[in-house]
Curated annotation (Swiss-Prot):
GO terms for molecular function: identical protein binding; phospholipid binding. It comes from Saccharomyces cerevisiae (strain ATCC 204508 / S288c). GO terms for cellular component: fungal-type vacuole membrane; membrane raft. The keyword Nucleus does not apply. May be required for vacuolar fusion. Overexpression leads to fragmentation of vacuoles, missorting of the vacuolar enzyme carboxypeptidase Y (CPY) to the exterior of the cell and accumulation of multivesicular bodies inside the cell. This is Protein IVY1. Residues 102-122, 230-257 form a coiled coil. GO terms for biological process: vacuole fusion, non-autophagic. It is found in: Vacuole membrane. Residues 353-371 have a biased composition (Low complexity).
Length: 453
C-alpha cells in the first residue's frame, strides 16, 4: 500500500506543485519543510496518520507527537505566526516633537500680557525723560544768554543744550515706537491669539464628542455580534475594521488640534519678533547718530576739550589724582625739578619729548586722559618752551613742534621717560662738561692772579 501511494503521487501530472510525501524507513510519512504550507498545518496530522498496516492507538499518538515536534523544529514553522494585517497609516500624537497643552497656551497669554505692561511703562518713562531733557536743554540755553557769560562759554553751553535737545527728541521717538509697535499692535495680537485659541478648543471639543459617540455605537455593535451563537467571520472582521477606523479618526483629530495649537503659538511669536526687531533697529540707529556728535567735526569738539574723562581708571578724584587734590599730582614733577636744578637740558632728557600730532582733525582727548595735570607742570612746560624759542629752533624743529606741550595743547600725550642707560650716559656727559667748566674757571683765575702780580 505505501508503494501504490508513492507511485500514484509520482505518476500524477501536477506532482511538482502538490505536497510531497516520502516514506521514512517504513514507519510514517514525512512532510518536506520546503513545501510546508502554514494555513494547512491542522491537516498534516490527519494525512501523516495514514498507515498501511494495522497499529495500536498508542503508536498513532506517538507518531502524531513526533510529527508536531518535527514541524516546530523546522524554520518554516517559526514563521507561521504573522502579525496582524490591519495597520494604521494615520498620524498620531507620538509623531509630534512638541505638544502645546492648555497650560502652555495660558503661559503664552501671560507672557504677552507682561510684555504689554512693561512696554507701556517703558514708553511712559521715556516720554517723561524726554520732557526732563528738554527742560535741561532750555535751562542751559538761558544760562548762555546771560550778560556775564562770554562768547566762548556761551557757544559751548549752546552746544551742550543742542545735545540735550537731540537726546530728548530721540527719546520721544522711541517712546512713540514702543507705544505703537509694542502697545496697540501687541494688544491686537493678544486678542487674536485668545480668539483663535477659543475657536480651536470649541471645534475640537465638538468633533471629539461626535467621534466618541460613534466609537461607543461601534463598540456596542461589536458586542452584539460577539453574543451570537453562529459567528460570521466576514462580518466580524468588518466590524473590527470599522472600530479601528473610528479610533484612527479620533487620534487624527487630537493630532491636528495639537498641531494647530503649535502653529498658532509659533505665528504669534514671529509677529512679536518682527515688532521687537523694528524697535531694536530704531534704537541702534538713534544711538549711532548720537555717537557721531562726539566724532571729529561733529560739533562738540571744543566742548569736549574742556571735559574730564569720567571713565578713567587711573584716577579717582575730580582733578585727575587719587585723592582729588591737584597739589599731589605735581610732586613727581617738582622732585624732578629739584634734582635737576635749573638745567633745562637735563629736565628735557629725563622727561623726554612727545611725538607731534600730524592730524588736526582727530578727536581731541579730554583733560582727564593724561596721567597728571597740575599748574606746576604747565609752568615748567612754559619755561621749557621759552628756552626753545630763545634757542632759535635748534635740531630742525619749528615753532609748531615746540609748542606741542603748551597751554593750547593741554590734551596732548604725557611725556615719556628715557631708559636707565640713556640717563646714566647723560649724567656722564654732564659730569665731564662740568669738570671742563671747572678746569677752565681755575685757569682763568690763575691768569687773573698772574696779571695782578
Amino acid at each position: 500500500m505505501p508503494d501504490n501511494n508513492t507511485e500514484q503521487l509520482q505518476g500524477s501530472p501536477s506532482s511538482d506543485q502538490r505536497l510531497r510525501v516520502d516514506w521514512d524507513n517504513g514507519n510514517h510519512f514525512d512532510v518536506s519543510p520546503d513545501r510546508y504550507a502554514p494555513h494547512l498545518s491542522e491537516f498534516y496530522p490527519i494525512v501523516n496518520s495514514k498507515r498501511p498496516v494495522a497499529s495500536s492507538a498508542g503508536s498513532e499518538n506517538n507518531d502524531h507527537l513526533d510529527d508536531m515536534n518535527h514541524l516546530r523544529s523546522s524554520k518554516v514553522y517559526s514563521k507561521a505566526r504573522r502579525a496582524s494585517s490591519i495597520t494604521s497609516g494615520t498620524s498620531t500624537i507620538n509623531d509630534l516633537q512638541t505638544l502645546i497643552t492648555k497650560r502652555d497656551v495660558k503661559e503664552t497669554q501671560e507672557a504677552l500680557s507682561t510684555l504689554l505692561r512693561n512696554s507701556n511703562a517703558y514708553s511712559d518713562s521715556l516720554l517723561k525723560t524726554s520732557q526732563n531733557g528738554a527742560e535741561i536743554a532750555h535751562s542751559l540755553e538761558n544760562i548762555a544768554k546771560l550778560k556775564g557769560c562770554n562768547d566762548e562759554t556761551a557757544e559751548k553751553l549752546l552746544s551742550a543744550s543742542g545735545l540735550f535737545y537731540l537726546l530728548s527728541n530721540h527719546q520721544l521717538i522711541m517712546s512713540k515706537y514702543f507705544n505703537d509697535l509694542l502697545g496697540d499692535n501687541l494688544i491686537d495680537d493678544i486678542d487674536e491669539f485668545e480668539l483663535q485659541t477659543k475657536i480651536m478648543e470649541n471645534k475640537f471639543k465638538a468633533q471629539s464628542k461626535e467621534q466618541s459617540l460613534k466609537l461607543k455605537l461601534q463598540e456596542r455593535h461589536n458586542f452584539d455580534i460577539s453574543k451570537r451563537k453562529i459567528r460570521n467571520l466576514i462580518s466580524y472582521r468588518e466590524s473590527l475594521s470599522s472600530l479601528q477606523a473610528r479610533l484612527d479618526q479620533l487620534e487624527t483629530l487630537k493630532h491636528d488640534f495639537y498641531m494647530d495649537s503649535y502653529e498658532l503659538v509659533e505665528n504669534t511669536c514671529n509677529k512679536v519678533l518682527s515688532k521687537v526687531a523694528t524697535v531694536s533697529r530704531a534704537q541702534v540707529e538713534i544711538s549711532e547718530n548720537i555717537a557721531r556728535k562726539g566724532w571729529s567735526g561733529g560739533g562738540l569738539d571744543e566742548l569736549l576739550c574742556d571735559a574730564d574723562d569720567p571713565f578713567s581708571k587711573k584716577a579717582d578724584g575730580p582733578y585727575g589724582t587719587i585723592g582729588g587734590d591737584g597739589e599731589t599730582a605735581g610732586e613727581a614733577y617738582n622732585s624732578d625739578e629739584e634734582t635737576g636744578g635749573n638745567d633745562v637740558v637735563l629736565n628735557e632728557l629725563l622727561e623726554g619729548t612727545s611725538q607731534p600730532s600730524t592730524s588736526k582733525t582727530s578727536l581731541p582727548k579730554s583733560k582727564g586722559s593724561s596721567t597728571v595735570s597740575t599748574p606746576n607742570h604747565s609752568q615748567s612746560s612754559s619755561n621749557k618752551d621759552g628756552v626753545r624759542n630763545n634757542g632759535g629752533g635748534k635740531n630742525g624743529e619749528d615753532e609748531d613742534t615746540d609748542n606741542l606741550m603748551g597751554t593750547e595743547n593741554s590734551f596732548s600725550l604725557p611725556p615719556t621717560r628715557n631708559s636707565a642707560e640713556e640717563t646714566t650716559q647723560t649724567f656722564k656727559q654732564l659730569s665731564i662738561k662740568e669738570d671742563n667748566d671747572n678746569h677752565s674757571s681755575d685757569t682763568d683765575g690763575m691768569q687773573d692772579q698772574s696779571s695782578n702780580i
